[in-house]
Amino acid sequence: MILYAVLGAFAAFLLYMDVLYPFVIYPLRARWHKCGYIPRDLSWPLGIPLTLVVLSKLRKDMLLQFMAAQDLSRPYKTSLRQFLGKWVIATRDPENIKAVLSTKFNDFSLKERGNRMRHVIGDGIFTQDGAPWKHSRDMLRPQFTKDQISRVELLSHHIDVLIREIRKSGGNVELQRLFHLMTMDTATHFLFGESVGSLEVSGESKGIEITDPKTGEIVNTVDFVESYTFANKFALKKIILNDLEFLADLTEPSYKWHLRRVHTVMDHYVQLALKATEKYDPDDDSEKGEYYFSHELAKLTRDPLSLRDQLFNILIAGRDTTAATLSYAFHYLTKNPAIYAKVREDVLTVFPNGDASLATYEDLRKAKYLQMVIKEVLRLAPAVPLNTRAAVRDTYLPRGGGPAGNLPVFVPKGTAVNYPTYILHRDPDIYGADAYEFNPERWRPENKLPNSPMYSWGYIPFNGGPRICIGQQFALTEIALTMIKLVLEFERLEPADDFEPNLQDKSSLTVMVGGSGVRVKLS
């Protein structure tokens, strides 16, 4: 009897989720709210087939290409689809994305995505909603003034270390790994006032060495980078598993140990910041010395947990995204030697003596063709390729419903709206027939078109609206300076013998070049 009851309950649940909701309940509620019919991408039962395909493609580093091929082959840009039993709305329509991120901003939140990331990276600006998020934004935004984001001298030292490492290897290197080490160093230097020195770790030197006060374990730079990388992947796994996120905890029992190692390092710098600012007097001009991000935050809050969480959030955003953009830039430039030569020519017009050691923030903006290349890299490889929000109340998107797709789309409270930036940036309706091609020329001012992404929400590498990335100018400064110093140092960029020109785009919390990375020869 119990078995029959269980089977009956499951059959009723299946009937509701796979038939009644998509074909009866949702359409009736949409009509009540004066919204139109929306296409349905069916994957019976409970979206399980789609879920299994997504997990399979993710393991093979083929998820982004698979999703783009699927979505761009459909005649519509907004649809209702099922994933792990839940019905979600997916859209690549710029007007709908604008509504989610800007015009109807208060109708949406991070919801489960924020909660799941919070279990890993803490309660900070990238995991918060509502009043806590506004408080964090107001606290953090002043730290990204032009004076701070244009600290070229801070970045320049670490880029010089990168160049030294490339020279040591004879110019035959895998750049993606080096870029991730360099951006870890620049990010920690900016945040903590000193770098963890991951690029300089070699032989007997293990970089920083910090003792966990609870366990006595010594955590060095190698340990920190390893555990930080694990935390990144673990957070993504929890997001993908959705309501089954507990499976991530069960299948990765070492996650607590990895997080403890990361926290050991973060807590060390938090305590240094608290100690350095314990007698802070805002009216005492003599205290205004060298800028440290952690010290400035410690002047605003004395809560060590809050400080750690905010610093962890900023580190995640500032390190991996910049490394991803630099990696893709050199991947595409390796495949396009004529464009590399043109970038070098452009940079030499700004720095005719071949020396950018005294470059200023304003100098970086003068390399116009380089800026076009960076824009194109961010189009094809947006650092955060997939994103989502959830409706906090019954609301609607401006279009996508009805036979012609020009009626509003009903979004019930609690429903997730997925907007894949990676696919949006490849839409031929926005970028033309060559949307998949690496073509910096499309960004020339004279090439502006009525449907140009410069005038729409078809180009959002840093998101948009109130939650637009507050550190984007710092990231663009680091990307531009790194590329300038590398092209000035190395006249030639060639593929290494094991360079893979047609790599898959790998999705972690950020996008990464898959396969063996970016294997090149620089000379």
Curated annotation (Swiss-Prot):
Q: Where does heme bind?
A: 469
Entry EC no(s): 1.14.14.80
Query: What are the transmembrane regions?
Result: 5-25
Q: What induces it?
A: Up-regulated when grown on alkanes as sole carbon source.
- Please state where this protein is localized: Membrane
**One Pfam family it belongs to:** p450
Q: Which family is annotated?
A: Belongs to the cytochrome P450 family.
Q: What is this protein called?
A: Cytochrome P450 52-N1
Name the keywords, alphabetized. Heme, Iron, Membrane, Metal-binding, Monooxygenase, Oxidoreductase, Transmembrane, Transmembrane helix
Q: Does the keyword Heme apply?
A: yes
